[in-house]
Swiss-Prot record:
InterPro entries for this protein: SASP_SspH (IPR012610)
Keyword Phosphoprotein: no
Protein name from the UniProt record: Small, acid-soluble spore protein H
Location in the cell: Spore core
Protein source organism: Alkaliphilus metalliredigens (strain QYMF)
Organism ancestry: Bacteria, Bacillati, Bacillota, Clostridia, Peptostreptococcales
GO annotation (BP), single: sporulation resulting in formation of a cellular spore
TM annotation in the entry: none
Keywords, comma-separated and alphabetical: Sporulation
NCBIfam families: SASP_H
Length: 59
């Protein structure tokens, strides 16, 4: 996923399905300098991680 689309998903009022390693996630924010996103699994909001944008898949 590119950074522009990730930002659009964050700003969207709708819930857009995105996965990381096959698991549904929520994108919290995007770091444009490192091309990464801070995410958490939908079912584990307390488990945050920073992952490469390239590994995020929109469905």
């Amino acid at each position: 996923m590119d950074k522009t689309r990730a930002q659009e998903i964050i700003s969207s009022p709708n819930m857009i399905s995105v996965t990381y390693n096959g698991k549904e996630i929520y994108i919290e924010n995007v770091n444009e300098n490192t091309q990464t996103a801070n995410i958490h699994l939908l079912n584990k909001p307390d488990k945050k991680q920073e992952v490469p944008l390239n590994n995020l898949v929109e469905h």
